């Protein structure tokens, strides 16, 4: 084999999803307890953050000739650790028992990709995986949806910020990650379930929001968020006047107005004000307000409403990323 290290890394990276895919076993002293539903999604997310923190630390140590790159990687490592702590850590099935040395243990946390562009794409792909789970009301309650999406959106924001630091697109490593997956499949006969394969449908892509109006017409969350998006859009021209180099303001304004219109077209109650201006007009404050409006939709019991909020949040994390004074929290919550 010409590239044993790369092959080993491939196996390590892609085994993470397989290790968390949940073989349902009876709980006993000789078998791992069953891990299903939201608990399975939560642990997959936690394992991703643990792997991301480890890889970001190691890459930062190698970036000696680019101090800004090293700083961005260390920031990502810290954010990943915060998200891991927010989730409660990686699943420990025997934490309340003594003498666990001889008991079966979950798979160890696997390694994330080594190359920067592939690492970034891996972060994005895993975020979409978690957001799909968070948008499904049959597998996650509103509270669980907000918890999982808070981590996934924070991870996506970290990917966007790291891509900016290296001046590359967030999807620049998609082909490389796909190649790793193909090598893994050839070696094991299995397909990593977290990968969005090119040219093929996948359970990990976000479903499209349907055009039916019933979910939005009965959603208080959709009505409230629509008002917020419209008001933020009306405030943006004032913010642009008072903020130096806020070149993104018009683009963001148009995106928010379009989002509000699409929400109304789907049946959301129209409670917009003819004239509306927020008191806090800094780009940072407006970005936070917009993300709160997005995440608010995850309190809905409707998959369509949740999906609309998820897509809005992903759009906002990209739209606001270059605005002056704007930074994103490690965990994107309603607060």
Name each region found by the language model.
Residues 1-13, 145, 306:
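N-terminal export and membrane-targeting signals
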Residues 16-20:
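C-terminal motif of bacterial Sec signal peptides marking the signal peptidase cleavage site
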